[in-house]
Amino acid sequence: MLVGTSSNTIFAKEIEKNNEIPAVKVFNKENNIWNSKYFRIPSMQTLSDGSIIAFSDIRYNGPNDHGYIDIGCARSVDGGKTWGDYKIVMENDRKDSTYSRVMDSTTVVTNTGRIILLAGSWNKDGNWAMTTSTLREDWSVQMVYSDDNGETWSKKVDLTTNSSKIKNQRSNTIGWLCGVGSGIVMDDGTIVMPAQIALKENNVNNYYSTIIYSKDNGETWTMGNKVPDLKTSENMVIELDGALIMSSRNDSTGYRSAYISHDLGETWKVYEPLNTKVSTGKGSGCQGSFIKVTNSNGHRIGLISAPKNTKGGYIRDNITVYMIDFDDLSKGIKELGIPYPKDGNNLGGGYSCLSFKNGHLGIAYEADGSIEYKDITSYYLSIN
């Protein structure tokens, strides 16, 4: 069932109209402590004490991916109504005043309460996957963590120049970074982070979605294998009956791809109930968020946020939230609402991150160079 039917659209509009959900600026390009001109790439976690912590690229000089970038965070203790406690959680290497950057954060909260953040790091110009034909020498993946709910953060830990930290990295790797957004902790305690990897294959640079996982609270990581389709990249995963289900960006089909693994990413196959069911329009694909919740009937629900991109290119308009009922797949994919019913900024927009805890659902999303938050618990309550 392809989303976007008239009945689903009417349903979503009714939710939006009836609730008139206010948007709150978390990172404001017009007014911020860093004098940053642009913010991108939201990640968000709701903590055990009910506070919400949001993360963003601090793109000091503008939207460009290849610029001077740090990663910052903000906290809300009132359900997202107000935000404060702004701080930098990961600095770039300070090697190049134009190009040094850490960016595209992915976060997870472990069973011990540790918040882990992983990000890609570079110090030269150029695309992460296409600029070099061999392992890129200025690239690394860095990790920081907090054991006090984000009040203080560790120094950076380099995962990629120390082979004891990351296992099963392919010899033909150009580079990799995490999938952008959030990871999960499986029922057995395994931490799984979405990832994307660029590989040299038959003298061509290709990129794919994958995962990394840790069984020791993030001390060491193992890389899974790539999904079957190239031009997949940013993704998020959920656990269902011990399997991993992935919803992934795809830059060639105009739809989000979906895969399932029953062996912790060793092998993947297409997950038909979700594959190519969410349209992302003509042109480049886009990052999207994917989380699992349980509704009042006890059904396990997958929630996806992604732009419709009806205007094509990099406009990435109408960031929309969809649902799939894993316990009643006959329902197909339904549209729940459109938290950002506007055009994106074609210089950088369309990304989002969902977070759910204790019956409260929130979304952080890109809004013309700022990051906004909405409490969309009404979407969750509408699921039946």
Task: Name the predicted role of every residue range.
Residues 2-17:
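Sec-dependent signal peptide cleavage junction
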